Amino acid sequence: MSKINKLEHIRNIGICAHIDAGKTTTTERILYYTGKSHKIGEVHEGGATMDWMEQEQERGITITSAATTCRWQDKIINIIDTPGHVDFTIEVERSLRVLDGAVAVFDGVAGVEPQSETVWRQADKYNVPRMCFVNKMDRMGADFYRCVEMIKDRLGAKPLVIQLPVGIEENFKGIIDLVKMKAVIWKDESLGAKYFEEHIPADMKDKAEEYRAKLLDMVVELDDHVMEKYLSGEEVTEEEIKILIRNGTISAAFYPVLCGSAFKNKGVQPLLDAVVDFLPSPIDIGIVKGMEVNTGEEKDFPISITEPFSALAFKIMNDPFVGSLTFIRIYSGKITSGASVINTVKNKREKIGRMLLMHANNREDIKEASAGDIVALAGLKDTSTGDTLSDIDTQVVLERMEFPEPVIELAVEPKSTADQEKMGLALSRLAAEDPSFRVSTDHETGQTVIKGMGELHLEIIIDRMRREFKVEANIGVPQVAYRETITKACEIDYTHKKQSGGAGQFARVKIIFEPLKEVKDLKDEDKNKTFVFESKIVGGAVPKEYIPGVEKGLNNIRETGVIAGYPMIDFKATLVDGAFHDVDSSVLAFEIAAKAAFREGMPKGNPKLLEPIMKVEVITPDEYMGDIIGDLNSRRGQIQSMDPRGNAQVVTANVPLAEMFGYVNMLRSLSQGRAQFSMIFSHYDQVPSQVADIIKAKK
């Protein structure tokens, strides 16, 4: 296969969904049918190939996204299996950043669940073309048509139904392919490897005709020539329909919807065909955004094998046999083991040691990789998640990833003082792997504090510390990660001088602090940031080389706010004026001046305390509704919606995280164990003043 041609044959896809929708099972079946896995792993038996960390096998949930390469027809499919639990949203986010397409798996019984919405929004953010697989069609209560309606209503997406289920619940036996207008039926033996095309059953003919007409109405809109043909009553060919479905999927005009039961081995091969037929190759994506290091110019770089090398490091993982592995997605050029590249974010050279193609937890050594490939590199010293690796002569920085702020924190200490150093090493390794996990030291108590996206997230970190690094730790009570912000703009003019003998220090800064939501001309790339710095210095009032000192000072000092010492977020600092001294000024002097300006200026901005608000969804039988709503209200919750789902009710509410500790036990006792809930971080909001007073008093 020629190198250029190879790009057309690659599909980089993610499989993402709500917890328990059947992602890992679907991926397992894909590996089985593409010949990469000789035994089907079952999640509920703890044997799934993709779930390879011990905790995943025990809990039956996928925690880290394992990358796997397999082949179908003449195509190479790189699959990233992503976690569906809300505490691991960061894993989904970073996978989506490097993928070209995704398969969203939905539970045929539950339909679109809260995490499905979150993942969908993340995929929207990165413009990832995707298709939908309605799984678990063999389960009691599965309803394909309701699921399609939910995709429309809840996700605001345009579903294009290309398959219909044949049989329902335990009688589910196959699908109707609306492109070929044939039924595909699985016989129960041979693990679903054998299936047969048949005529559409008589009792489904009308339904198939109805959905075929809907399909054609949607796809012909994309091509005037085919539309004319269709409207004049001519036959639209299978090939034409496939091309239009592909074009519409890649341009996100609609999302193809397929169905099946991965657990019962039905519907997986047509899903693979659809991945190959309809999801984009790297060539279809065409470009990647980045910046030329030499000129500082932002531009679109072509995804091509003939361009100089560039790649994005999207995951770091500790492998018990190889050590630290850095997963990269190559966007342009090629790379060979032993070559030197540059990390353009840190300006450090890296030498490529071993290069591996990963299959869940098995690895294959390779000597060369090129644009479109997803590979793991061993032996990189300075590269972390989100960094760019680039050709040394033609340096580029690819668009960075954004990582959410942690919402929960705990104090940890080793059970024996001998383990103190080991614990420090373990936590720094784990933080390098996971950018949504942070480690810091409390300056007042000297305690080590770990911060993450939820209780399960931190539980698993502590578990990994015990298993992988043999460190036993005592843990404190979970604490909410409060934040501070300002609510009005203020200006401060501060001069720092120290000129009492010896080398002096002098720096004057004039800074405007303002709430981000009040900034009129905020650039697109700053819209998701929690702190924005801008210099509007003209005429050299502050020399260019001192301005980074101002930004560094503000970045450091904002970690301890002025109300209760929590980090300050959601504000912009604009350096508008200043002064310097030829001899006594330095970067350090401007750093000190910026810190002092912050301390003096922030109290004038009417600072407020913020708390994380969680979107909580409770699914409960009717009879417990009253008690559950009453309890959510008592937790300062705001009910957003109440919807029937089957014979249950779904209550959605926004509730402060501080009020949600121990909720699982309360819900169990309120509903005799019949209700379930999920929660996900929504936003930060101001803390009511009486609650803020209690928080300040505790600090």
Swiss-Prot record:
CDD domains per the UniProt record, alphabetical: EF-G (cd01886), EFG_III (cd16262), EFG_mtEFG1_IV (cd01434), EFG_mtEFG_C (cd03713), EFG_mtEFG_II (cd04088)
Residue intervals of the tr-type G domain: 8-283
GO biological process: ribosome disassembly
Record-linked SMART domains: EFG_C, EFG_IV
UniProt keyword list: Cytoplasm, Elongation factor, GTP-binding, Nucleotide-binding, Protein biosynthesis
Cited InterPro entries: EF-G-like_DII (IPR053905), EFG_II (IPR041095), EFG_III (IPR009022), EFG_III/V (IPR035647), EFG_IV (IPR047872), EFG_V (IPR035649), EFG_V-like (IPR000640), G_TR_CS (IPR031157)
Domain of life: Bacteria
Gene3D superfamilies per UniProt: 3.30.230.10, 3.30.70.240, Elongation Factor G (Translational Gtpase), domain 3, P-loop containing nucleotide triphosphate hydrolases, Translation factors
Subcellular location per the Swiss-Prot or TrEMBL entry: Cytoplasm
Residues bound to GTP: 17-24, 81-85, 135-138
UniProt function note: Catalyzes the GTP-dependent ribosomal translocation step during translation elongation. During this step, the ribosome changes from the pre-translocational (PRE) to the post-translocational (POST) state as the newly formed A-site-bound peptidyl-tRNA and P-site-bound deacylated tRNA move to the P and E sites, respectively. Catalyzes the coordinated movement of the two tRNA molecules, the mRNA and conformational changes in the ribosome.
Protein name as it appears in the record: Elongation factor G
Species of the source: Rickettsia helvetica
